[in-house]
From Swiss-Prot:
Highest taxon of source: Eukaryota
Tissue: Expressed by the skin glands.
Lineage: Eukaryota, Metazoa, Chordata, Craniata, Vertebrata
Family: Belongs to the frog skin active peptide (FSAP) family. Plasticin subfamily.
A Gene Ontology cellular-component term: other organism cell membrane
Notes concerning its domains: Plasticins have huge conformational plasticity. They can display random coil, alpha-helical, beta-sheet or beta-harpin structures.
Stated name of the protein: Plasticin-DA1
């Protein structure tokens, strides 16, 4: 009976070790994917900001030239 208990514990241990290793690798991959997503959204935010700044500058120049021409 003691032999069966030891065998069962050994089997459970050998099953849990690879499982925990797989979970750790999965967490690392998820963290890498999240970091990549954050980097991409940061780039998109930069592009949108640049577009808004350019559009604002163009509108400012247009309004300035229109109001300057009426005087």
């Amino acid at each position: 009976m003691a032999f069966l208990k030891k065998s069962l514990f050994l089997v459970l241990f050998l099953a849990l070790v690879p499982l925990s290793i797989c979970e750790a690798e999965k967490r690392e991959e998820e963290n890498e994917e999240k970091q990549e997503d954050d980097d991409e959204s940061e780039k998109k935010r930069g592009v949108v900001t640049d577009l808004l700044n350019t559009a604002g500058g163009l509108l400012g120049n247009l309004v300035g030239s229109l109001s300057g021409g009426e005087r």
